[in-house]
Every structure is written in C-alpha cells, then in structure tokens.
Amino acid sequence: MADCAAPVGVFDSGVGGLSVLREIRQRLPHESLLYLADSAHVPYGEKSPEYIRERCRVIAAFFVEKGAKALVVACNTATAAGVTELRELYPQLPIIAMEPAVKPAALATRSGVVGVLATTGTLKSAKFAALLDRFAADVRVITQPCPGLVERIEAGDLESADTRAMLMGWVEPMLAQGCDTLILGCTHYPFIRPLLQQLLPNDIRLIDTGAAVARHLREMLAERHLLASGDATQRFYCSGDPQRMARVLPILWGENAVVEFFPS
C-alpha cells in the first residue's frame, strides 16, 4: 500500500510538462511532486516510438525507485508511444496520461473546423487517429506539425518576432479555412497561449488538457485513499543541462528551484 505522503512523479521530454505541473500544484497543493525533464532527448516528437518507449521505461523505473505513488506522463508523444507498456509493467501504479483534446474541441467548435498544433510523433500515432475516429467524425480537423517550436519554448523564447512569425505561418492557413477552435496538442504549447491570444481573433478558442489531467489525478488518488494532507515539496530533475533548466524555471514555473542532474 502506497503512502499518502509519497510523491507524484511527472515527466516530459523537456520543460513543457511544467504546464501540467502548474495545474497539479494549483488543484492539489498538498501533493509532493517529482518532475523530470528528459531534455537530453528532446524533442520526443521527432524520435521513433521504440526510442520513446525506452525513455519511458527508464524514467518510470526512476520514479518507482523514488517511491512515487502515481505517475503522470505529461507528454502527448510519450503517451502515444509508451503509456500502454508502462501500464503493463506497473499494473498497481496509477498512471495518468495526456492526449490531444479532440473531444472537447469537437464539442466546442461552431464552424465545424478544428485545428491541431502538435508534434509529428503525436499526429502520426495510432492513438491520435483513434481519437479522430471516435470524437471528430462530424467535424473537419486540420493538423499542423510544429517542428522547432518545442526547442524555442525550451529556451524560454515565448514571444520573439521569430516565434510570432512561426506561429502565424501555421495558424493563418487554418483560419482561412474556417477554423474557430485550436487544440494545443503538446504540453509545451500552453506556454505560448498568451502569444496566440495576441495573434488570433478573440473568438478563436484555445484548448489544452492540463487542467483535465490534474482533475483526473485527483480522482485517481481519492479513489485509492492516497490524497496527501501535509506540506508539499517539489524536486526537479533534468537529463540535459540542469543550469539551463534552472534559468527558465522562473519563466515557466514561476519561481526559482534547484535542478538535479538525471544521468541517462
């Protein structure tokens, strides 16, 4: 039986999962959190499924060794490639995963046209195709891979002229085709939501799944009587350059923190 005070492990290919971690901290302030940015291997979206599955196995084993009571795969690409295997490896461990918000977007659109910004890996995955078949049969979905955007966000570049131009090159054709609802299909992308809100008409809806994941985590912990009640701590790990991650934490997490090296 896991300890209520045990931490929750959260990981992503880089710092994008901090958008999910913020939602978890807001809704579950008593939960201690372990966050691992696998920045030595970012971006996952351009890697093979087997490569990503191996990274998932390594990171999940690390969190289990640290005594984590639950695992959040805060990465759409890692979910698509690796979460099924993780659930087979750790059947007793609550594992919460990400997927693009196709269902809420299909319900929200008024024009019947939904746009998706995501990584190549997510858009090519069988899981994404299944989501479209299940929830988007009655709407038109325009998909757009976003090469280079994760790297810009990793560097804390959330509003430069180059980032603006990159985004507009992707979203303007969607708008021209009647898109009124845009899915942010990568956990990095909520960090450029403020920029998108500046660039897009006010009636364009932006949808991501960070808050839904935090709610799902709360439900799973409550079902297992694992909700914490004491003081919470956060520890950060990085397989890339910990100092580089520490520099962007004030921007993306909202405060400074020590980042420990994760040898991989």
Curated annotation (Swiss-Prot):
Substrate binds at D12, S13, Y44, G45, N76, T77, T187, H188. The active site is at C75, C186. InterPro entries: Asp/Glu/hydantoin_racemase (IPR015942), Asp/Glu_race (IPR001920), Asp/Glu_racemase_AS_1 (IPR018187), Asp/Glu_racemase_AS_2 (IPR033134), Glu_race (IPR004391). The keyword Iron does not apply. Pathway: Cell wall biogenesis; peptidoglycan biosynthesis. It holds the Pfam family Asp_Glu_race. It catalyses: L-glutamate = D-glutamate. Keywords: Cell shape, Cell wall biogenesis/degradation, Isomerase, Peptidoglycan synthesis. Its EC number is 5.1.1.3. GO terms for biological process: cell wall organization; peptidoglycan biosynthetic process; regulation of cell shape. One of its GO terms (molecular function) is glutamate racemase activity. It comes from the Bacteria. Belongs to the aspartate/glutamate racemases family. Provides the (R)-glutamate required for cell wall biosynthesis. PANTHER family: GLUTAMATE RACEMASE (PTHR21198:SF2). This is Glutamate racemase. It comes from Stutzerimonas stutzeri (strain A1501) (Pseudomonas stutzeri).
